[in-house]
Regions:
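Bacterial N-terminal signal peptides that target proteins for export
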Residues: 2-13
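Blade-edge motifs of beta-propeller repeat domains
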Residues: 26-42, 73-93, 130-153, 170-172, ...
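Beta-strand-rich domains and repeat architectures in extracellular enzymes and scaffolds
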Residues: 36-63
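Beta-propeller blade termini
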Residues: 45-54, 95-105, 155-165, 206-214, ...
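Glycine-aliphatic tripeptides that mark coil-to-beta-strand junctions in extracellular
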Residues: 56-60, 107-111, 138, 167-169, ...
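Short, solvent-exposed loop/turn segments at conserved positions within beta-propeller repeat blades
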Residues: 66-67, 120-125, 177-178, 224-227
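Conserved small/polar residues in nucleotide/adenosyl-binding loops
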Residues: 270-275, 279
Length: 280
């Protein structure tokens, strides 16, 4: 009984420390929703920030689940959609996740759209990897040489990962009812390297975040549903699941979202589920 009381007290203290600073700094945030010119009700499950059209300005890429994908850019103090090409807006593929990073090392970020037209397992439409050539948008997954490893499994989240620490990015795809994917450019072809990187696990993937969690390179934390969470430690560019050792498997709970933050300003990173850390 005493142990239980101590455990509950620790939870209360943790929540207090988490919430109380936010109360003090609430005035730091300002609601700018009115700056969005067209903002009807819609289903949007993902957002990323990148320079969509190579004009030197950052834009918001907002996914549409049965609605148009948007690229919101500031014009005269207002956020307006600047992309209307079908290959980008693509309302019928039901985009649920998005991430942007420079996969082909051309100096500009590509946009990975994770599409999900079914709840779990095999889906009809593959994902898109959008590149802008200066005039029009292209889906690199529609290039013949890149079709070998298309993702045809329902998914929920994507994250960009620089696993080697040299600026070479890959995309971790958290699938639901099928194996995880990890896409990289290799010999000028987009390939799935999940098997050789020890990432090809089957689960109900929900959320994923990448960062310097427990090593000096980018690690991966994946919150899952109907199964254990994954905590992948970067082991010289490959990954080792250490969720059990760090007690973040949480098999009795369904993960939905996750984030990394130095919530105590202590130079330690924490996930939303447990105290995974690194030293600054």
């Amino acid at each position: 009984m005493q142990f239980k009381l101590i455990k509950n007290l620790k939870k209360i203290i943790f929540l207090f420390l988490l919430i109380f600073p936010n109360k003090l700094n609430a005035s730091f945030f300002e609601d700018l929703t009115s700056q969005i010119v067209e903002n009807p009700k819609r289903l949007s499950y993902g957002v990323s920030v990148t320079d969509v059209n190579k004009d030197g300005n950052f834009d918001f890429v907002v996914t549409g689940f049965g609605y148009l994908n948007l690229a919101l850019s500031y014009k005269d103090g207002k956020l307006i959609n600047i992309v209307n090409e079908n290959i980008f807006s693509d309302e019928f593929r039901r985009t649920i996740g998005v991430a942007a990073c420079d996969i082909d090392k051309d100096g500009y970020e590509e946009i990975y759209f994770l599409n999900t037209d079914t709840y779990s397992g095999t889906k009809k439409y593959s994902d898109r990897l959008i590149d802008f050539d200066g005039n029009k948008f292209l889906d690199l997954f529609e290039v013949e040489k890149n079709k070998k490893d298309l993702n045809l499994t329902a998914g929920r989240s994507v994250a960009c990962v620089d696993r080697k620490g040299d600026g070479t990015y890959g995309v971790y795809v958290a699938n639901y009812g099928g194996p995880t994917r990890f896409y990289e450019y290799s010999d000028d072809v987009i390939v799935d390297k999940s098997v050789q990187l020890n990432l090809a696990k089957v689960t109900g993937g929900r959320a994923v975040v990448a960062g310097h969690i427990i090593s000096n390179k980018m690690d991966i934390f994946a919150a899952n549903e109907r199964g254990a969470n994954f905590l992948y430690k970067n082991n010289n560019g490959k990954f080792l699941d250490v969720a059990y050792e760090y007690r973040v498997e949480d098999v009795l709970q369904n993960g939905r979202g996750t984030a990394l933050s130095d919530i105590y300003y202590s130079c330690l990173l924490y996930t939303s589920d447990a105290a995974d850390e690194r030293h600054c």
